[in-house]
């Protein structure tokens, strides 16, 4: 029997409201697009860019974290909250829509940056660029 032992996420520290996003781009968006964004039901967003709405308007910015850093943080949190022996883990599923790079994949990068926390014989799956359904697909893959 296959058991899902634990799951965790990590999000960037920079938080902004959708209204800020629309406000900073008001002069560049059509009324139809503004209406569509307003009806999505997403009030709060996260970004690795410390000034994301202004960045879209052309102001320079810098990244506050990388997808790999967030993945390592989530992996460490996942193992800590589970509280079990990391050697019992048989599969690492890493999911993102915004990888730092295409290759090596996110799961491989996490394995390399967890400094021996995970077994080198651990199987890995990286799920990238799959849209909103990536969370559900990740759980499905983990239970397969």
Language model features: what each stretch is:
Residues 2-90:
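Conserved active-site "lid/cap" helical segment
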Residues 90-98:
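Short glycine-rich or small-residue beta-strand-to-loop segments that form or flank ligand, phosphate
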């Amino acid at each position: 029997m296959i058991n899902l032992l634990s799951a965790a996420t990590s999000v960037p520290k920079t938080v902004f409201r959708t209204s800020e996003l629309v406000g900073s781009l008001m002069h560049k968006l059509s009324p139809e697009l503004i209406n569509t964004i307003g009806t999505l039901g997403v009030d709060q967003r996260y970004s690795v860019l410390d000034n994301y709405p202004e960045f879209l308007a052309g102001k320079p910015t810098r990244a506050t974290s990388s997808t790999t850093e967030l993945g390592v943080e989530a992996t460490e949190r996942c193992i800590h909250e589970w509280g079990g022996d990391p050697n019992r883990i048989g599969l690492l599923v890493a999911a993102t829509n915004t990888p730092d790079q295409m290759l090596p994949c996110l799961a491989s990068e996490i394995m390399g940056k967890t400094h021996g926390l995970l077994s080198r014989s651990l199987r890995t799956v990286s799920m990238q660029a799959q849209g909103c359904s990536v969370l559900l697909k990740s759980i499905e893959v983990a239970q397969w």
